[in-house]
């Protein structure tokens, strides 16, 4: 299968886009990949917003977003912008708009860019199931055009940029009923708005396709690029990358690295934000670590250096590569088996005394037990002997090759028979990555391949401590949804809409529930996006009023206005009520 979203899945080529100016910052074209973040302060609090924005600018943030949930909030953007400019800070400001076209019109007077969510800019989500006739659908689009046109015309006349940012969890009922809760629906939602803007000769557009599920996120961005390529060469708009509700700590960093890093490897992405449930300033250095290897100053497009076969999978629809079935020391690999975690021999045997402490994070095999066949996927002489093997074998890429792991393993998957299994590696040059780059690089390389459905086992070579290497391997499997070994969390990064201390609440919820393998809990700051953005969570903890929490089962609110100090205990009670609780070991 040919790649339709990038020139080649086997080498780096940055997607060519037009330049869009966001104030004094160029996005796309030949510009660097720009780093963004979002204020957590209340937009009505001018001093707090200015202080936080100055800290972000000092940290290297190039574009700063603020929430503007009503026209009154948006009006205070005038004061924030004036104070920042008076302080000598000229970082462009972006107003984040949901549900309120009048807030967008007010905000556009004062900031350099407007972000709209096409799922709720006009449509009010009611979770209704209905069939739309073509005529009814057209009427809805006409209503959308009527509401959206004034903002487009204002932005065009005043030099404002706009991001059309679809979110997986907040698609409109109209889109859901026609396209489903899918990447196709996310793309169509954005294209509808973009077509209206283009018809009005407005082109200062940036797009995003965010989701908390990284497989959905990667598929949606790829599908967006494929769709824009098909629509014509003048649909060459820049793209902003982000994983919504990635969480905090190492989990949030790994999840962001999987989603954002996968797309950067594909040459997609002109701006990015790492959304962490932490102070906003802590997002910036992580964003730079992710983007640095792909900045134009660091690398150029790779030349064609070997014959490039068709892909062995559909990059727009996730499907696990189904290899054969093999048994190694009592551990099954391959067909319908979980992806396994391996570590080098010495580390594996050293960990045997820690089996009880390691629990579900214990590596299942040593590298020696796997007896993997190492090959250069470009070399016919290495691959031909595999055809003669009677049984499925586990194959990996040789260390030391001058290839990036993602491209090397994609090539391997395309060139070997499906019956053979694949051992993924985070790096082909052990020792070449160090410090904080180790988990980000591993998550980018292994996570990208897992999102492509490639891999039957993983080996972390960049981390020398076998315990940490095993934890990292399982955390990457968790982040991609490939294999769950503990509770999973969808946690929003906080913004000016957040109604309680979300960092503290998230930490308490994790401490109480982390042992609940396979249970997915959403921790959301407010009811503006909370119910929609919870995606496929089993339970939700959502701010309903200042320091008051509403609890959800799936998308349904079941408990209301619980004082924050009681809410975690009540969440545990709810999990017990629905039969998902087990006592920690």
From Swiss-Prot:
InterPro entries: Dihydropteroate_synth-like_sf, IspG_atypical, IspG_bac-typ, NO2/SO3_Rdtase_4Fe4S_sf. Binds 1 [4Fe-4S] cluster. GO terms for molecular function: 4 iron, 4 sulfur cluster binding; 4-hydroxy-3-methylbut-2-en-1-yl diphosphate synthase activity (ferredoxin); 4-hydroxy-3-methylbut-2-enyl-diphosphate synthase activity (flavodoxin); iron ion binding. It is an enzyme of class 1 (oxidoreductase). Keywords: 4Fe-4S, Iron, Iron-sulfur, Isoprene biosynthesis, Metal-binding, Oxidoreductase. The keyword Nucleotide-binding does not apply. Its cofactor is [4Fe-4S] cluster. Coiled coil: none annotated. [4Fe-4S] cluster binds at residues 492, 495, 526, 533. Pfam families: GcpE (PF04551). One of its GO terms (biological process) is isopentenyl diphosphate biosynthetic process, methylerythritol 4-phosphate pathway. Its EC number is 1.17.7.3. It catalyses: (2E)-4-hydroxy-3-methylbut-2-enyl diphosphate + oxidized [flavodoxin] + H2O + 2 H(+) = 2-C-methyl-D-erythritol 2,4-cyclic diphosphate + reduced [flavodoxin]. Belongs to the IspG family. Converts 2C-methyl-D-erythritol 2,4-cyclodiphosphate (ME-2,4cPP) into 1-hydroxy-2-methyl-2-(E)-butenyl 4-diphosphate. NCBIfam families: ispG_gcpE. This is 4-hydroxy-3-methylbut-2-en-1-yl diphosphate synthase (flavodoxin). It comes from Akkermansia muciniphila (strain ATCC BAA-835 / DSM 22959 / JCM 33894 / BCRC 81048 / CCUG 64013 / CIP 107961 / Muc). The gene is ispG.
């Amino acid at each position: 299968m040919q790649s339709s979203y990038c020139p080649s899945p086997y080498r780096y080529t940055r997607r060519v886009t037009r330049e869009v100016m966001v104030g004094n910052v160029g996005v796309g074209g030949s510009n660097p990949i720009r780093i963004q973040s979002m204020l957590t302060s209340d937009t009505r609090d001018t001093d707090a917003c200015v202080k936080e924005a100055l800290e972000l600018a000092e940290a290297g943030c190039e574009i700063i977003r603020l929430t503007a949930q009503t026209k009154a909030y948006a009006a205070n953007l005038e004061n924030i912008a004036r104070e920042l400019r008076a302080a000598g800070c000229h970082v462009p400001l972006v107003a984040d708009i949901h549900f309120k076209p009048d807030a967008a019109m007010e905000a556009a007077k004062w900031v350099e860019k407007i972000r709209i969510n096409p799922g709720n800019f006009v449509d009010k989500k009611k979770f209704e199931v209905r069939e739309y006739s073509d005529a009814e659908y057209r009427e809805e689009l006409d209503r959308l055009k009527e509401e959206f046109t004034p903002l487009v015309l204002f932005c065009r006349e005043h030099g404002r940029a706009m991001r059309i940012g679809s979110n997986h969890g907040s698609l409109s009922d109209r889109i859901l009923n026609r396209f489903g809760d899918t990447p196709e629906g996310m793309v169509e939602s954005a294209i509808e708005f973009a077509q209206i803007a283009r018809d009005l000769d407005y082109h200062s557009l940036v797009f995003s396709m965010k989701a908390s599920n990284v497989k959905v996120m990667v598929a949606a961005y790829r599908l967006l690029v494929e769709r824009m390529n098909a629509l014509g060469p003048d649909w060459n708009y820049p793209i902003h990358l982000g994983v919504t509700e990635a969480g905090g700590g190492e989990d949030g960093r790994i999840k962001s690295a999987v989603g954002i890093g996968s797309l950067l490897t594909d040459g997609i992405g002109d701006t990015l934000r790492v959304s962490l449930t932490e102070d906003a300033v802590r997002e910036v250095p992580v964003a730079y670590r992710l983007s640095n290897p792909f900045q134009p100053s660091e690398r150029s497009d790779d030349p064609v250096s070997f014959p490039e076969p068709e892909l062995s999978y559909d990059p727009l629809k996730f499907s696990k590569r189904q290899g054969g079935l093999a048994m190694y020391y009592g551990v099954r690999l391959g067909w319908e088996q979980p992806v396994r975690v391996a570590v080098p021999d010495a580390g594996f045997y050293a960990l045997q005394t820690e089996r009880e402490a390691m629990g579900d994070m214990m590596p299942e095999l040593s590298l020696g037990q796997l007896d993997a066949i190492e090959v250069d996927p470009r070399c016919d002489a290495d691959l031909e002997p595999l055809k003669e093997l009677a049984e499925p074998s586990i194959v990996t890429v040789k260390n030391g090759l001058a290839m990036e792991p993602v491209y090397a393993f994609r090539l391997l998957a395309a060139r070997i028979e499906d019956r053979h299994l694949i051992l993924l590696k985070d790096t082909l040059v052990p020792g070449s990555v160090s410090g904080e780059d180790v988990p980000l690089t591993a998550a980018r390389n292994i996570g990208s391949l897992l999102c492509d459905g490639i891999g039957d086992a993983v080996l972390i070579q960049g981390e020398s401590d076998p315990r940490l290497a095993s934890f990292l391997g399982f955390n990457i499997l968790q982040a991609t949804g490939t294999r769950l070994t503990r509770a999973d969390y969808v946690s929003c990064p906080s913004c000016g809409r957040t109604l309680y201390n979300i960092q503290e609440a998230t930490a308490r919820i994790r401490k109480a529930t982390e042992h609940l393998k396979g249970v997915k809990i959403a921790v959301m700051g407010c009811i503006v996006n909370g119910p929609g953005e919870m995606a496929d969570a089993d339970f939700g903890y959502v701010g309903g009023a200042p320091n008051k929490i509403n609890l959800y089962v799936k998308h349904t609110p079941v408990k209301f206005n619980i004082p924050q100090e009681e809410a975690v205990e009540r969440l545990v009670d709810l999990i017990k009520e629905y039969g998902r609780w087990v006592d920690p070991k």
